[in-house]
Design a protein with these regions (language model features):
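A short glycine-rich, Lys/Arg-flanked "PGG" loop and its adjoining helix->strand segment in the class I
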Residues: 136-150
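N-terminal, positively charged/glycine-rich alpha-helical extensions of SAM-dependent methyltransferases
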Residues: 1-30
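A short acidic, Gly/Pro-enriched loop at the edge of an enzyme's catalytic core
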Residues: 113-123
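Class I SAM-dependent methyltransferase SAM/SAH-binding core
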Residues: 63-113
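A short SAM/SAH-binding and catalytic strip from SAM-dependent methyltransferases
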Residues: 122-135
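Short alpha-helix
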Residues: 171-192
Length: 210
């Protein structure tokens, strides 16, 4: 896959180890017009902290799918997890090679095309689920996750199609179809959390910067 130049530009401009949204515990008190880039990076740190709080205690090995530039993998390593990473992006592969020098094994592949060499306790899809085709994605997940293992997805999903044709409607997976397909491949929902309000200041902040 060619380089995603939008994500590359973002990472080089913001100088954050993360490519995902920020997370605010009290979003109603946030004034986006007063954002600084440092505050945004801290909020991105809270995002992965909150996400990792959902990982069950019996998880030791994690495949970071759509691994970006390694921020999530670094956090997982700091918490004692054994981490490997996957992304089809050439630039992200280069970043991982420079950052980890082989400490974190990196697979340059679409998840749908991934041929796992082993099985993992957990597959993490942090804002990458929407890039993965639903049916082949769950088929690969079933082959990649050990029996009794987990998939932790954090992304935006479509609850209602307003017919607007906006990018977020086109990009998001239909949540009902996504979950029904998961069940088809033997996975069931354990826990969910709607963090829409917690992450919305990210978009408000982007507007303020523009």
């Amino acid at each position: 896959m060619p380089i995603d130049h939008v994500l590359k530009l973002y990472s080089e401009s913001v100088r954050s180890p993360y490519l995902h949204y920020g997370f605010w515990d009290n979003p109603e008190s946030v004034n986006a017009s007063e954002f600084t880039l440092n505050e945004m990076v801290k909020a991105q740190g809270r995002y992965i902290e909150h996400l990792v709080s959902f990982i069950p205690e019996d998880v030791k090995t994690v495949l970071d799918v759509g691994a970006g530039i390694g921020g999530n993998s670094s956090y997982l390593l700091s918490k004692g997890y054994e981490v490997e990473a996957l992304s089809p992006d050439e630039y992200q592969e280069k970043v991982f090679a420079e950052k980890y020098n082989g400490e974190v094994k990196f697979y340059r592949s679409k998840f749908e095309d991934f041929k796992p060499e082993k099985k993992y306790d957990l597959v993490l899809e942090s804002e990458s689920a929407c890039y993965i085709q639903i049916e082949p994605g769950w088929e690969t997940a079933r082959k990649t996750i050990r029996d009794g293992g987990y998939l932790l997805a954090s992304d935006y999903f479509l609850h209602h199609n307003d017919g607007s044709g906006d990018w977020h409607v086109k990009a998001a997976h239909d949540e009902k179809v996504y979950m029904e397909t998961a069940e088809k491949y033997g996975l069931k929902l354990i826990r969910e959390y709607d963090q829409t309000e917690n992450t919305m200041p990210t978009l408000d902040g982007v507007k303020a910067f523009m």
